[in-house]
Amino acid sequence: MPEKLEIKVLDGIVWASVSGRFSLENAKTFLLEILQRGRVEGINKILIDARSITTEISTIARFEFGNYLVSLNPYQTSIAIVGNEDAVWPNRFLENVLVNRAVDVKVVTEIKEALKWLTK
């Protein structure tokens, strides 16, 4: 799990910053918390900054995380995930899993790019 999760609302976007070691079970917990904050605030744009995750995330964990996100039914929500280059690749796997399941998501390496996409 990210050892630290910070959530704030700024300019109509739920900003979540996560850091520390990755654990699939804890990642599911923080994802649920982030989506719930958006629903409580009536905000359908979420930016998750995961650049401070310190461990490699396996392909199977990315797939399972994607399936869990789909199970939360975020279809009215746009989600931008910012990660380090090595976390985003290979081939934007997490993004492909989610887009193929009709989730409005973008996985990028820069906050600017995430904000541009969210405010499109």
Predicted regions span which residues?
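Amphipathic, Lys/Arg-enriched alpha-helical "gate/interface" segment within cytosolic domains
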Residues: 1-120
